[in-house]
Every structure is written in structure tokens, then in C-alpha cells.
């Protein structure tokens, strides 16, 4: 099947609350890399109070926000937790960044109290003294090139044996000790990497698009568009 006959629908969850680190850049990257291939793409934004129908979505983005905003979002999402869980277990594609990453797990324990998580992945996060702030480079088996970004988080996330997004080559990662960053569960990626993540790492964007198309249409041959500018920017970050 020609990719020009395909369509991807991206759900951006709560951009009114979870857009602390420019997560709309991740949406823009996904859209562009679909359009460059002739794949029809649309983004639907779901803000507080909106009804979310996961059956109509191919990729879901959960961005980052403050602890207060995370608590508001989680309270809303817990009302449809079973639908979100079904989407994940059925292979639905999710990219969750920073606060969104923390919401995937069982809980986020902060100095102010406990934020209940969505329990979509068996992980948990606890706030500890000091923030982990630096450039970061990962070796991820999902893509061929190093994954680069910037991390800035006070929470330490523990994976309970789940697969990490990547091995830390430079930076702190999930907890500053394990040597790993992020989590991968089925077609879910959770990560602390900002940048935004996807414009800095177009291969990760293509991985998400590939998984979404395969879930919807079966086997797909995705030909990656080559962008010299993107590759040079990526190589510069990886060399830091």
C-alpha cells in the first residue's frame, strides 16, 4: 500500500497545561515528516474537559508541566484510564515527555505529597534533592544514531525491570545512577529529553510514525526523507 493513501491522526493531550518545554515542536515534527512523505496527517488537541476517543488516534503526545498541572491532568485522565490502558495494550503509539513520562507510572512522590499515576507502565517516580540538568546523549536500539537532548528534572524514575529508552552516554538519565534513560513499553516511549526531542532526533520521529502506520495498515515500507540541516544539527548535539 502506498503511504500516500495513508493517514495518521495525532492526539495532543492537554497542551493548555502540558507544554512547559515546547512540546508543540514535537507535534510539528511529526506532522512535517508525514507530509514530506505524502502521508495525510492531522492533529487534534484535547484540553481540559474535552472528550478523548482513543480509537480515533494513531499517536498520542503527553507533554511536560509543573507538578500542579500534572495533578490536574492526571485527575482528568484517571476517569478514562481503562480506555487509555486499552489503547496502550493494543499497540497504540505514545510519546510522553518529562511530566507526561512520570504520569505513565504508578505514582510520582513529591515533597508536597503523592500524585497518582495512570499505571499504564510499571514504573514510579520519586522527587529527590537537587535537579538533574544537563545535555544528554543516549544509545538507543530503536534508532541507528545517538539520541540527543536536554534534561531538567527533580524526579527520579525507576523502571522495575522495564526496558529503557536508551543507555546514557552523557548526562544523568532516569535517576542519575542506573545509567539508563526513559522507558519503552510496547509502542510507548517515556523520556525526560527536551529539545524538543523529535526535531533534534528525526529518526525517533520516524520510528513513531512507522509503528503507527504498521498498527493501522500492516507492514509498511517507510522511506525516510533526508534533511541535511536536521542531520547536521543532530551531529553537532551528539558531539557536545
Predicted regions and their residues:
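C-terminal and late-domain segments of enzyme folds
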Residues: 2-3, 146-147, 156-232
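Cysteine-nucleophile active-site neighborhood
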Residues: 67-140, 144
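Short, structured patches in soluble enzyme cores that scaffold and shape functional sites
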Residues: 122-125, 149-154
Amino acid at each position: 500500500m502506498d503511504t500516500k493513501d495513508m493517514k495518521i491522526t495525532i492526539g495532543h493531550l492537554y497542551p493548555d497545561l502540558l507544554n512547559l518545554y515546547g512540546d508543540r515542536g514535537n507535534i510539528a515534527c511529526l506532522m512535517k515528516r508525514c507530509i514530506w512523505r505524502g502521508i495525510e496527517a492531522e492533529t487534534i488537541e484535547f484540553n481540559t474537559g474535552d472528550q478523548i476517543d482513543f480509537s480515533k488516534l494513531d499517536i498520542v503526545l503527553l507533554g511536560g508541566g509543573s507538578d500542579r498541572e500534572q495533578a490536574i491532568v492526571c485527575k482528568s485522565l484517571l476517569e478514562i484510564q481503562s480506555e487509555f490502558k486499552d489503547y496502550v495494550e493494543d499497540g497504540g503509539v505514545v510519546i510522553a515527555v518529562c511530566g507526561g513520562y512520570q504520569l505513565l507510572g504508578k505514582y510520582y512522590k513529591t515533597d508536597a505529597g503523592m500524585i497518582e499515576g495512570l499505571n499504564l507502565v510499571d514504573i514510579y517516580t520519586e522527587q529527590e534533592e537537587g535537579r538533574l540538568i544537563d545535555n544528554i546523549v543516549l544509545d538507543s536500539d530503536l534508532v541507528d544514531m545517538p539520541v540527543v537532548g536536554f534534561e531538567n528534572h527533580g524526579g527520579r524514575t525507576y523502571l522495575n525491570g522495564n526496558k529503557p529508552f536508551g543507555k546514557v552516554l552523557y548526562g544523568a538519565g532516569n535517576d542519575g545512577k542506573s545509567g539508563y534513560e526513559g522507558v519503552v513499553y510496547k509502542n510507548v516511549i517515556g523520556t525526560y529529553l527536551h529539545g524538543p526531542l523529535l526535531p533534534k532526533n528525526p529518526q525517533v520521529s520516524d520510528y513513531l510514525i512507522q509503528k503507527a502506520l504498521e498498527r493501522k495498515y500492516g507492514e509498511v515500507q517507510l522511506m525516510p526523507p533526508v534533511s541535511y540541516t536536521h542531520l547536521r544539527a543532530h551531529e553537532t548535539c551528539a558531539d557536545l
